[in-house]
From Swiss-Prot:
Positions of post-translational Deamidated asparagine modification: N101, N123
Glycosylation sites: S162
Pfam families linked: Crystallin, HSP20
PROSITE patterns assigned to the protein according to its UniProt record, in alphabetical order: SHSP
Binding site for Zn(2+) 1: H100, E102
Protein name according to UniProt: Alpha-crystallin A chain
GO BP term, example: lens development in camera-type eye
Amino acid sequence: MDVTIQHPWFKRALGPFYPSRLFDQFFGEGLFEYDLLPFLSSTISPYYRQSLFRTVLDSGISEVRSDRDKFVIFLDVKHFSPEDLTVKVQEDFVEIHGKHNERQDDHGYISREFHRRYRLPSNVDQSALSCSLSADGMLTFSGPKVQSGLDAGHSERAIPVSREEKPSSAPSS
């Protein structure tokens, strides 16, 4: 039996009208709404299924903004409380770590952990960094930029995560 090998360029998720091959699926991800609707999955071919692009986009994607005056990171951490999050700055990097122990949900028990590391621009004032968690679970890490030529104060330190009562003003992806 011959198996066709696809170049990664052809594996791009192009939406519901360009399904991915069954062999390209993410095993262990569970069933999705379109898996339960037979006319969507079998209309084209029984060996094709819809792309998981939307699912991947909805799973904790971060957004980094760096403009003239400030540097901001938005990170979706809706499954974590401020006590579960650790944010620290080390040299030119900000490290965000989240971990919660096993807890029960509607489908059984689940534990989550992630670790993100971002490079800070050299002109970010590290003494004025802040981090907050909105009511809808959006973590916002920000710091002002200083004029070039001034010392931005690089050192290792922890940044406390404060909780906001209002939803985030970050744009939805």
